Amino acid sequence: AFPALKGRLRFLPKHIFAVKSVDSVKTSLLGRRVFLKSGADIVIEKTEALTVIDVNTGKSAASYKEVNFEAAEEIMRQLRLREIGGIILCDFIGMERCDGEALTAYMRELALRDPSHPEIPGMTALGLMEIARKRS
């Protein structure tokens, strides 16, 4: 019926959203819990004053350090995707046993990829990572 489209269209046996992983992206944007590849997860809670992100080991067999670095990447990704701005506090796991300086340096490196140029002052006295990101 449309010879100009012959060879340019193909039949997909599955729903296009499943093939292109749109459902998983949509779920990760709308849900408060985001699962990481390691089996760990992060929980994002927005309030009027600030956003709090909690890192949980979940079913991960990885070390605290590995989970925290994986979570750092996903946190910075979620901040961009959800356009979260303002004050953000991240509660990483086992910070008394993890190198907070290395994690802070890594977060600052990841922040360089963000067009809103978030500030990463570092860790609070209670071991929470502070992030200040411009609101969109």
Pin down the residues of each PLM region.
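Extended, charged alpha/beta regions that create polyanion-binding interfaces
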Residues: 1-49
